[in-house]
A protein has these predicted regions:
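Regulatory cytosolic signal-relay segments
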Residues: 1-28
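Acidic loop->beta-strand submotif enriched in PP2C/PPM serine/threonine phosphatases
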Residues: 27-38, 132-165
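Catalytic core of PPM/PP2C metal-dependent serine/threonine phosphatase domains
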Residues: 30, 60-128, 140, 144-147
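Primarily the active-site beta-strand->alpha-helix module of PP2C/PPM metal-dependent phosphatases
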Residues: 33-86, 155-157, 163-177
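A short alpha->loop->secondary-structure connector
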Residues: 122-135, 173
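Hard-cation-handling environments
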Residues: 180
């Protein structure tokens, strides 16, 4: 298991970001990746989970986080980022898929933009209780993205889980990674 924690002050707001990853039993590499980018004003956090486990999943999630981090840092629009990732990931010979989930959190002061692709929806703890948040659904190359804009108060948290094996289901009941995703 690996845990990383980073605290940074952005625009008079303190962001505490912690990541816990755990390798699948018997695997030396983890299929989850997290990229953290900080500057004086903002933070960008990208989480990705590659299809499968071990080396294959690690390659997919590493490519996804690296490409998204680089493109977002260069202010590339999200639709172009998603298209580039989809066209670049190597195809799995067994499953005939090139697939990795991702969640992007971009902060600006006490506000944040949250973009989620095929991960369970993040849990937003607002004022000490699990809060509901709205999201718009956007389709980019048949990929369903959930985009939200959140406001954080002192003590608020955003918890992002990843999918777990083939048993995970999306909020609408479909299996993660089902055809068209």
């Amino acid at each position: 298991m690996m845990m990383r924690k980073r605290t940074n002050r952005c625009r008079n707001t303190v962001w505490d970001i912690s990541v816990i990853s755990r390798n699948k039993n018997g695997e030396t590499l983890c299929g989850d990746q997290c990229a953290l980018e900080w500057d004086d004003n903002d933070a960008t956090v990208i989480l990705s989970d590659g299809l499968g486990s071990g080396v294959k999943a690690n390659i997919l999630s590493t490519l996804t986080t690296t490409m998204l981090t680089t493109m977002l840092k260069g202010n590339v629009p999200i639709d172009e980022c998603v298209t580039t990732v989809a066209e670049t990931l190597p195809m799995c010979k067994e499953r005939k898929l090139a697939y990795a989930t991702f969640t992007i959190l971009q902060t600006a002061g006490t506000r944040a933009r949250l973009i989620q692709y095929d991960n369970p929806n993040a849990v937003f703890v607002h004022n000490g209780a699990i809060g509901k948040y709205n999201y718009s659904v956007n389709f980019i190359q048949e990929k369903e993205l959930h985009e939200s804009y959140l406001h954080f108060d002192v003590g608020d948290m955003l918890l992002q889980r990843r999918r777990v094996g083939g048993r995970a289901r999306r909020d609408d009941g479909r299996r993660l990674g089902a055809a068209g995703h």
